[in-house]
Amino acid sequence: MKDIIVQPNITIRQAMKTLNTSGRKCLVIADGKNKLLGTLSDGDLRKAILKGAGVGDFIHDYYQKKPTVLVEGQYRLGEAKKLFTNYKFDLIPVVDDEGKLSDILLWERIFKNANSKLNKKL
């Protein structure tokens, strides 16, 4: 998962390359001390470019600074599933009490068993 964690001082081009390489739809932005700063989706990048941003511009003006997060030890699997299905999230950052990134929940990890059951029925 480290391949989708980036610092806020990268360019839009670098973010696009990271998304492309990772195969994800969203990146997690954290500082050098692993404090969560936000998320940046492929949609955020499209909106930035449509507003006139260049691929050489830095992402700090375009990422979501108040993303949906779950707090370590304070959420249930059902809550995570509801967030994923209601908001079509690709991932949800999990932070500790100090706001440091402790995990990243990925859609396919949460719904792995559901997909297996569906494939068996088909």
Segments predicted by a language model, with ranges:
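Phosphate-interaction motifs
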Residues: 24-25, 36, 51-59, 75
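N-terminal intrinsically disordered, low-complexity tails enriched in polar/charged
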Residues: 1-8, 42
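N-terminal glycine-rich phosphate-binding loop and ensuing alpha1 helix
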Residues: 118-122
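The conserved cystathionine-beta-synthase
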Residues: 5-24, 30-31, 49, 70-89, ...
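Bateman (tandem CBS) regulatory domains
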Residues: 1-4, 57-67
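Short beta->alpha transition motifs characteristic of CBS
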Residues: 21, 28, 36-50, 93, ...
